[in-house]
């Protein structure tokens, strides 16, 4: 699901809200979450999951084009940990296209 699909679905489910208002709400929520993470804060949405930053230490990488070694600096990357309710909700879901891969 893309951001525009989410806005469209929410607009249909909440018919009393204008599409522009839903668009603004979704964009504001995502902006606030991005701002909180970039400020080093952790975001926890009970039942859904938590967003935090994980540190990736400096390492030696390789330029795939030339094959030469490149020193890569340490950095923080966003990390999502699903909550218990979300894990339980998706535990029995089989992604599309994988049904034929099951062998008995």
From Swiss-Prot:
Listed GO biological process terms: DNA recombination; regulation of DNA-templated transcription; regulation of translation
InterPro entries from the UniProt entry: Hist_DNA-bd (IPR000119), Histone-like_DNA-bd_CS (IPR020816), IHF-like_DNA-bd_dom_sf (IPR010992), IHF_beta (IPR005685)
GO cellular component term, pick one: chromosome
GO MF annotation, one: DNA binding
Annotated TM spans: none
Disulfide topology: none
Keyword list, A-Z: DNA recombination, DNA-binding, Transcription, Transcription regulation, Translation regulation
Gene3D superfamilies documented for this protein: IHF-like DNA-binding proteins
Reported function: This protein is one of the two subunits of integration host factor, a specific DNA-binding protein that functions in genetic recombination as well as in transcriptional and translational control.
Family to which this protein belongs: Belongs to the bacterial histone-like protein family.
Oligomeric and partner information: Heterodimer of an alpha and a beta chain.
Protein name, as recorded: Integration host factor subunit beta
Biological source species: Xylella fastidiosa (strain Temecula1 / ATCC 700964)
């Amino acid at each position: 699901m893309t951001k525009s699909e989410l806005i469209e679905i929410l607009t249909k489910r909440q018919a009393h809200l204008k599409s522009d208002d839903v668009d603004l709400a979704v964009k504001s929520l995502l902006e606030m979450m991005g701002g909180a993470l970039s400020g080093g804060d952790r975001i926890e949405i009970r039942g859904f999951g938590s967003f935090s930053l994980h540190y990736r230490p400096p390492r030696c990488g390789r330029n795939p084009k030339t094959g030469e070694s490149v020193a890569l600096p340490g950095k923080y990357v966003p990390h999502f940990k699903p909550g218990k309710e979300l894990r339980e909700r998706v535990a029995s879901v089989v992604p599309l296209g994988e049904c034929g891969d099951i062998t008995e």
